[in-house]
């Protein structure tokens, strides 16, 4: 039996190896004799449950041209694609959701509120793109060799 320096407590194996009495140094941590020899148990907290925010519901809309897009059900605005203005509305979407077949409704009529022409009947308004040129533009040809910068000029620009 080994006592501490003050002679008040019996030292355990761990305290003998450390060379000091933990009960004398830290009396607030020890209530009884058994607590000095046992190690405290560490309890793990359960992981905090976090819920991911709900994603906004979207509907897939397949256009007659073969293109598809996803539109939010709360979006009442439309968009123009290949010259045709497409507008999707919530009642159409809810009616489509009740049925299994997506092609039950006729195509919606588009109202432009008198702002301009209706482009519903025009199917192809795409214009051919100009051919790409291989040479340099005329402006650079007129300037000549003003764009040749020497290595010493580059160093002065970088500094």
Swiss-Prot record:
Residues 102-139 are annotated as: Disordered. Its main location: host cell. A zinc finger (unnamed) spans 65-81. GO terms for biological process: symbiont-mediated suppression of host innate immune response. It is found in: Host cytoplasm. The keyword Translocase does not apply. Residues 110-124 have a biased composition (Low complexity). A motif (Nuclear localization signal) lies at residues 43-60. GO terms for cellular component: host cell cytoplasm; viral capsid. Keywords: Host cytoplasm, Host-virus interaction, Inhibition of host innate immune response by virus, Metal-binding, Suppressor of RNA silencing, Viral immunoevasion, Zinc, Zinc-finger. GO terms for molecular function: structural molecule activity; zinc ion binding. The keyword Zinc applies. Monomer. Suppress local silencing by interacting with and inactivating host adenosine kinase 2 (ADK2) in the cytoplasm. Interacts with and inhibits host SNF1 kinase. Acts as a suppressor of RNA-mediated gene silencing, also known as post-transcriptional gene silencing (PTGS), a mechanism of plant viral defense that limits the accumulation of viral RNAs. Suppresses the host RNA silencing by inhibiting adenosine kinase 2 (ADK2), a kinase involved in a general methylation pathway. Also suppresses the host basal defense by interacting with and inhibiting SNF1 kinase, a key regulator of cell metabolism implicated in innate antiviral defense. Determines pathogenicity. Belongs to the geminiviridae transcriptional activator protein family. The zinc finger is involved in PTGS suppression. This is Protein C2. It comes from Tomato pseudo-curly top virus (TPCTV).
């Amino acid at each position: 039996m080994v006592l501490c320096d003050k002679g008040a407590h019996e030292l355990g194996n761990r305290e003998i190896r450390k060379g000091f009495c933990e009960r004398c140094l830290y009396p607030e941590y020890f209530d009884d004799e058994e607590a000095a020899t046992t190690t405290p148990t560490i309890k793990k907290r359960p992981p905090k449950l976090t819920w991911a925010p709900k994603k906004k519901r979207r509907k897939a809309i397949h256009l007659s041209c073969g293109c598809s897009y996803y539109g939010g059900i709360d979006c009442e605005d439309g968009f123009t694609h290949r010259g045709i203005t497409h507008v999707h509305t919530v009642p159409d979407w809810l009616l489509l959701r009740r049925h299994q077949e997506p092609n039950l409704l006729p195509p919606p009529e588009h109202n432009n509120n008198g702002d301009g022409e209706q482009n519903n009947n025009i199917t192809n308004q795409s214009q051919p793109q100009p051919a790409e040129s291989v040479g340099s533009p005329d402006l650079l040809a007129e300037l000549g060799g003003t764009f040749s910068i020497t290595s010493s000029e580059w160093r002065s620009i970088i500094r």
